[in-house]
From Swiss-Prot:
Glycans are attached at N80. Pfam families: Trypsin (PF00089). This is Mast cell protease 2. Residues 20-21 form a propeptide. It comes from Meriones unguiculatus (Mongolian jird). It comes from the Eukaryota. Belongs to the peptidase S1 family. Granzyme subfamily. Coiled coil: none annotated. The keyword Protein biosynthesis does not apply.
Length: 247
């Protein structure tokens, strides 16, 4: 498919292309996903957008590179993002580290680290999520869970409460219709026969497989039909480790 046609068909899951949601999923038990981060983003054009992300260290959040902006505030300890609780911790981002090879057109290398201005306080509602080992392989057929505050229907606003959905890992063949899909650095996720998917607003949220973050929500077709493309975290462990070590 020609790149222009691809971009007519696809949109980024993040708020730069309107915030997304979990379709066909269920509401999470409050604070059962303590690593989840809700990102409030002021773009370079002074628009407000949102993404999801997840805490991997007390002062670092992992998300998608297309969720970058002029400034970002991270909300931790939230379930309903519109109903303030004592569990909330709002922390500004000190520095954004989008992958140096991220391409906004092909959406390759869609991964970013956010260094927080202060360390999060670890509580029952705020915790960290482990990452996979370097270049570890997760086989197709595995059923994982995507988590985020995205839409629950294509024509609905984003969800106020945290949602999750079960999604199956597919062979690379399942995403052959995406011109720029690379199996080595991306995951093809979601049964095309089921209307269960991530969508706008879920960008940057994790794909959880046995309690480990294996993927980062990147993009999906405009009509929200599965499969979706996630950034494969294990491929980027050397880069992640370098940023964490040096900062």
């Amino acid at each position: 498919m020609h790149l222009l046609a691809l971009h007519l068909l696809l949109f980024l899951l993040g708020s730069r292309a309107k915030a997304g949601e979990i379709i066909g999923g269920t509401e999470c038990k409050p604070h059962s996903r303590p690593y989840m981060a809700y990102l409030e983003i002021a773009t370079s054009k002074n628009y407000l957008s949102t993404c999801s992300g997840f805490l991997i260290r007390r002062n670092f959040v992992l998300t998608a590179a297309h969720c970058s902006g002029r400034s970002i505030t991270v909300l931790l300890g939230a379930h309903n993002k519109t109903a303030k609780e004592d569990t909330w911790q709002k922390i500004e981002v000190e520095k954004q580290f989008p992958h140096p090879k991220y391409d906004d057109y092909s959406v390759l290398h869609d991964i970013m680290l956010l260094k927080l201005k202060e360390k999060a306080k670890l509580t029952l509602a705020v915790g960290t999520l482990p990452l996979p080992a370097k270049f570890s392989f997760i086989p197709p057929g595995r059923v994982c869970r995507a988590v985020g505050w995205g839409k629950t229907n294509v024509n609905e606003p984003t969800s106020d409460t945290l949602q999750e959905v079960k999604m199956r890992l597919l062979e690379a063949e399942g995403c052959k219709h995406f011109t720029n899909f690379y199996h080595s650095s991306q995951l093809c996720v979601g049964n095309p026969k089921k209307m269960q998917n991530v969508y706008k607003g879920d960008s940057g949220g994790p794909l959880l497989c046995a309690g480990i973050a294996q993927g980062i929500a990147s993009y999906v077709r405009r009509n929200a039909r599965p499969p979706a493309v996630f950034t494969r975290i294990s491929h980027y462990r050397p880069w992640i480790n370098k940023i964490l070590r040096e900062n």
